């Protein structure tokens, strides 16, 4: 029998057979012979002037409000950023009768390259390809303006969002021409996701830097095996590839592990082969999809000196520039001096920006170790949880 522990959080990871967790009733030490990490992802935070104004939502927050609470973000809306999720949420908001004025993406969506690539999506996965066409038709039928090769460069308002400025972009260069200005009440902005892989980092799994997002991915083979023995990783906690790849890789891992306890049957081998084919197909789908949504790399380019970079502790870009000096040349040193990254999110959002500013100041390369080091507890945890006697779980 499989024991399911709901609402249980892992706050410490010291070894694959030494994980610490808790829920409302118990404290646990988990000692696993095989560990599968599937901790998902979080949205990237690209700082933009006055992005702390009420009315500025992440795309994921807008989707959660709509799907979980049947509540659309209010008033006149613009969906902006980069990636297919933004197209999806724009269509979902329109179906919910929301007033979406424009869908803005930093990719050049209507390039000649994309005209040839788009039909490939339908060939690789007809179901997902048709779903994407449906989203696009929803925008066209509602006469929502589609603006490509553009980014939000400023949010404007007194105590709440009133306007958004949209500028053209190419090769990380923001156009100096007069930006488009929209009168809005809400903005959903999203520039993709970063893997939530703190457990894998603490366990010493090999990492690979994503040079576009400056987020680390967990190195793994085709079936999700990491560099650490008996540690596996699936889903967006490994790299951002979507639900279908998580599903099929999870199936491959399950079959692999079951084969260690019993002799594999013909049906197991057939199921493994089918899952491997589907995984390969969806990996190809993602590769083509992100070629279509390929956009200039953005980290701190949309912020000015007064922009808040660390939202948890209200640290501005100017504060960071002031303290990045000849003897403060690492993310850890900046963290200790400015407290950026010491808030509840533990640097998940500001770490890439701190790395970028250090790199620009010193001309130093960014690698897998440039960001903030993972710490225990992984996320804010009550001290009573850490001090309370533990109930051991062997799994």
Question: Model segments located where?
Answer:
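Residues forming the flavin
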Residues: 1-344, 348-395
């Amino acid at each position: 029998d499989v024991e399911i522990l709901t609402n249980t959080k892992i706050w410490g990871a010291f070894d694959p057979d030494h994980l610490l967790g808790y829920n409302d009733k118990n404290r646990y030490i988990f000692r696993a012979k095989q560990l599968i990490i599937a901790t998902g992802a979080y949205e990237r935070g690209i700082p933009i002037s006055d992005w702390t104004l009420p009315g500025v939502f992440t795309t994921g927050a807008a989707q959660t409000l709509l799907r979980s609470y049947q509540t659309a973000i209010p008033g006149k809306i613009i969906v902006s950023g980069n990636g297919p999720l933004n197209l999806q949420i724009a269509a979902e908001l329109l179906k919910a009768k929301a007033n979406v004025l424009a869908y803005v993406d930093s990719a050049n969506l209507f390039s000649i390259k994309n005209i040839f690539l788009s039909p490939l999506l339908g060939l690789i996965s007809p179901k997902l390809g048709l779903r994407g066409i449906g989203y696009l038709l929803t925008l066209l039928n509602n006469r929502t303006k589609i603006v490509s090769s553009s980014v939000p460069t400023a949010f404007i308002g007194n105590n709440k969002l009133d306007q958004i400025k949209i500028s053209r972009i190419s090769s990380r260069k923001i156009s100096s021409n007069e930006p488009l200005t929209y009168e809005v009440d809400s903005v959903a902005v999203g520039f993709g996701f970063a893997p939530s892989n703190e457990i894998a980092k603490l366990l010493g799994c090999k990492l690979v830097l994503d040079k576009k997002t400056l987020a680390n991915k967990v190195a793994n083979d085709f079936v999700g095996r990491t560099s650490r023995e008996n540690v596996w990783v699936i889903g967006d906690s490994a790299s951002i590839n979507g639900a279908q790849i998580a599903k099929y890789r999870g199936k491959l891992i399950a079959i692999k592990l079951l084969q260690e306890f019993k002799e594999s049957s013909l049906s197991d081998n057939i199921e493994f082969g089918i899952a491997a084919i589907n995984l390969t197909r969806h990996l190809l789908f993602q590769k083509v999809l992100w070629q279509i949504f390929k956009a200039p790399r953005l980290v701190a380019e949309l912020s000015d000196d007064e922009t808040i970079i660390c939202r948890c502790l209200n640290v501005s870009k100017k504060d960071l520039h002031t303290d990045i000096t000849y003897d403060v040349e690492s993310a850890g040193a900046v963290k200790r001096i400015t407290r950026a990254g010491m808030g509840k999110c533990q640097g998940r959002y500001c770490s890439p920006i701190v790395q970028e500013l250090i790199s620009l100041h010193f001309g130093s390369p960014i690698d897998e170790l440039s960001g903030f080091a993972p710490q225990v507890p992984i996320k804010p945890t009550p001290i009573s949880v850490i001090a309370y006697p533990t109930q051991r779980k062997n799994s």
